């Protein structure tokens, strides 16, 4: 029996096809002595047991090599006073510590009561390389909790840039969680757990889920993720393994004259950027590469051979090789002045179905960390205003936040230095 596909081409029946596959498999020798390996696109058996340290000077999820799955969730805080806010931060610390290190799922002693765990990971909650990074927004420092004098000096409410089309429902938040793991199941489980434990303290404001390719995640930072415009995203990132450089670029330090509690934290800029992918896919390759300033396949700056080659703008003052308004040239002109605007990018792609106009709703969850929001993201974005890429991208949400310093030990909790001032 045969079937026809949508083009009228005859296809063999499923039974005959499977029989043929079985015969082919039977004729192939099997190397039983070889070590079993994970198939491409799947995680190794040990990946579920990967874990990141929870205690330390800084929160995990900032310098951590990017995991495959990610979620941004902004919340409004429902706490009634400062004591309630402390209860929230202590509770979040406890949940983050357990979820990131793994353990047996709690049993429900009375079946007449709701289960203590969602159960979506089964009886054992594997760490799965989970990190949950807590950041606070400008609005947390209003009159509710008496924290205004302790607000980080550069923290501010995100305002509109010329190309923005911001949706108020997708902006800002008292707190923001960046949840990352090897698999989306673990990310979803973590969110469910946190919401279950904080019904009187937190209310979800907005949420977006992101991803990078599994092979990029498995490279542990050695392979640059590719965004949904088909270009490598994050090539020019500073080396996150260079502690001295991270002190200069990412972490707030004592010499910045910030409130003392902020030392060890970082300013976080979040932008939800929608791509016009159908329009982009109809754009000639040469124009795409001119807009970015890079070769689409290799990621190399135009006129160069390798992804991490450093462009020499001094030898191309008129932009004949790399256009003056190209993305990479505007974002980082590589001058002495632009050294102060370095930041660590940690972006993810998103795909949400279709818009009301029938266009694919795809884009970028842009996240970056820096020790100074004004010198970092804000300065870079001002340079990018009017770039050629704006025709294909539209920022629709996000916000500016401050990622809290880390938790020193089991007696400490996130935000303790802020709340005990």
Curated annotation (Swiss-Prot):
The keyword Repeat applies. GO terms for biological process: iron import into cell. GO terms for molecular function: ferrochelatase activity; heme binding; metal ion binding; peroxidase activity. This is Deferrochelatase. Pfam families: Dyp_perox_C (PF20628), Dyp_perox_N (PF04261). Residues 32-51 are annotated as: Disordered. It comes from the Bacteria.
